[in-house]
Amino acid sequence: MTNTENYFKVGTIVNTHGIRGEVKIMAITDFAQDRFKKGADLFIDTKQGRIPVKVQSSRLHKNMWLVLFVGVTNINEIEKYKGDDVYIEGTARPELEDDQYYYDEIIDSTVVDLDGNKIGVVKEIMETGANDVWIVQRDGQSDALIPMIDDVVKSVDVDAKLITIDALEGLLD
C-alpha cells in the first residue's frame, strides 16, 4: 500500500460484476453518489502504487456501487484490483458544516463519558436515516450503539480523536 496522506478512502473493490469490466465497490463515504458519479477522479491503491482512474458510469445495486472506469472494457483489465481500496484526493473533500464529520474523522476515536471514563473506540458507523449511529467497541463487553444526536454527543475533538458523550440511562446496557 502506498502513502495515503492527503488521500481519503471512499471504498473497497470487493468484486467484479459481469464481463464488461464493472467493479463492485463497498462505499464508506457519506457522499457515495458524488464520489462515484460520471467523471469523478479516483485512485486505486495497489501493491504497485496508486493508479488514477476516472468514473465512466456508476449505479447502486444491492447496497454496492457498480462502477465502470474510463478505458476499461472487460473483466480481465480490472480483476487484478479486487480487494484494493479506492481513494479521493484530500482536495476533493468539501468543507462540512459544524457538527458534521467525515467517517475517517470519527472511526478509531476514543469515546468517554462526561467524567472522562473510557467507554470504547468507534469501529464503525451505521446510517439509519434519522441519524448516524456510532458502533463503539468496548473491552470485555458487547458493542455500544451511540446515536449521533445532541442529547448524547457533547463534544467531538477531531484532532485528538476524542468524543465525549452523556451516557444517558440505558444507553450502555
From Swiss-Prot:
PRC barrel domain boundaries: 98-171
Primary residence: cytoplasm
Disulfide feature: none
Keywords: Chaperone, Cytoplasm, Ribosome biogenesis, rRNA processing
Keyword rRNA processing set for record: yes
Listed Gene3D superfamilies: PRC-barrel domain (2.30.30.240), RimM (2.40.30.60)
GO CC terms of this entry: cytoplasm; ribosome
One Pfam family named in its UniProt record: PRC
Domain topic, free-text comment: The PRC barrel domain binds ribosomal protein uS19.
PANTHER family: RIBOSOME MATURATION FACTOR RIMM
Function: An accessory protein needed during the final step in the assembly of 30S ribosomal subunit, possibly for assembly of the head region. Essential for efficient processing of 16S rRNA. May be needed both before and after RbfA during the maturation of 16S rRNA. It has affinity for free ribosomal 30S subunits but not for 70S ribosomes.
Protein known as: Ribosome maturation factor RimM
